[in-house]
Amino acid sequence: MNAKEILVHSLRLLENGDARGWCDLFHPEGVLEFPYAPPGWKTRFEGRETIWAHMRLFPEHLTVRFTDVQFYETADPDLAIGEFHGDGVATVSGGKLAQDYISVLRTRDGQILLYRDFWNPLRHLEALGGVEAAAKIVQGA
């Protein structure tokens, strides 16, 4: 799979609650970054198992559907820049999430080396019921 296909596949895995499958798309030394994470939250996770420790609770706390996936063309098949929308529901709070994302993926040999995810953390905080509830997902607490 090229980087665009991997990004689309990764979104489907998250929609299906398969956080382990999502993490398995990463190279063992892959990196997940959230440049706009709120102060005090980690912005970088290095290594597939560290990413899994961060993402493992995602399906328990949030269901999401992604739509309007668009890509910005690049000359490199191992680089994808995607823009998409996500609508979700926080399982515990019942809060609704409407979020727009921009994700940059760098891949090699069908694995994610870098997934840089840009999103508005305030929308997640609102949907999840505040800072403490959001920390359970975002920080893997």
UniProtKB/Swiss-Prot annotation:
InterPro entries: NTF2-like_dom_sf, SnoaL-like. Gene3D superfamilies: 3.10.450.50. It holds the Pfam family SnoaL_2. Belongs to the PhzA/PhzB family. This is Uncharacterized PhzA/B-like protein PA3332. It comes from Pseudomonas aeruginosa (strain ATCC 15692 / DSM 22644 / CIP 104116 / JCM 14847 / LMG 12228 / 1C / PRS 101 / PAO1). The lineage of its organism: Bacteria, Pseudomonadati, Pseudomonadota, Gammaproteobacteria, Pseudomonadales.
